[in-house]
Swiss-Prot record:
Lactose synthase (LS) is a heterodimer of a catalytic component, beta1,4-galactosyltransferase (beta4Gal-T1) and a regulatory component, alpha-lactalbumin (LA). InterPro entries: Glyco_hydro_22 (IPR001916), Glyco_hydro_22_CS (IPR019799), Lactalbumin (IPR000545), Lysozyme-like_dom_sf (IPR023346). Disulfide bonds join 25-139, 47-130, 80-96, 92-110. Regulatory subunit of lactose synthase, changes the substrate specificity of galactosyltransferase in the mammary gland making glucose a good acceptor substrate for this enzyme. This enables LS to synthesize lactose, the major carbohydrate component of milk. In other tissues, galactosyltransferase transfers galactose onto the N-acetylglucosamine of the oligosaccharide chains in glycoproteins. Residues 1-19 form the signal peptide. PROSITE patterns: GLYCOSYL_HYDROL_F22_1, GLYCOSYL_HYDROL_F22_2. GO terms for biological process: defense response to Gram-negative bacterium; defense response to Gram-positive bacterium; lactose biosynthetic process. Keywords: Calcium, Disulfide bond, Glycoprotein, Lactose biosynthesis, Metal-binding, Milk protein, Secreted, Signal. This is Alpha-lactalbumin. Pfam families: Lys.
Amino acid sequence: MMSFVSLLLVGILFHATQAEQLTKCEVFQELKDLKDYGGVSLPEWVCTAFHTSGYDTQAIVQNNDSTEYGLFQINNKIWCKDDQNPHSRNICNISCDKFLDDDLTDDIMCVKKILDKVGINYWLAHKALCSEKLDQWLCEKL
């Protein structure tokens, strides 16, 4: 019985630390701290996150000379540091792998720095796909 409880506990803790693909309503709830920050509405953020990563907190995109991480696809040349790019400017002062978990606190802090420095156009999906007709990005459950 004790080994079953231990195994169950390990399974629960393992699951709790894993990154995940979030739902629209989970993203909507998690991003409340970004509401209207930099003049960007919450539905705009939900749309941008969807078109940037598909709500996947583990999303990694390798480019020719850089890599983008997490829900917001934060780049390792400027915003975070990893082994691939040890000379990053690391403006957010964080390891890129911190953007690959389901705790979005550090992601949101870095997103605010990106907004302050370069604005919402850092995310190409925003202008093309998320600047109008935003009703579909609301969460009806809340």
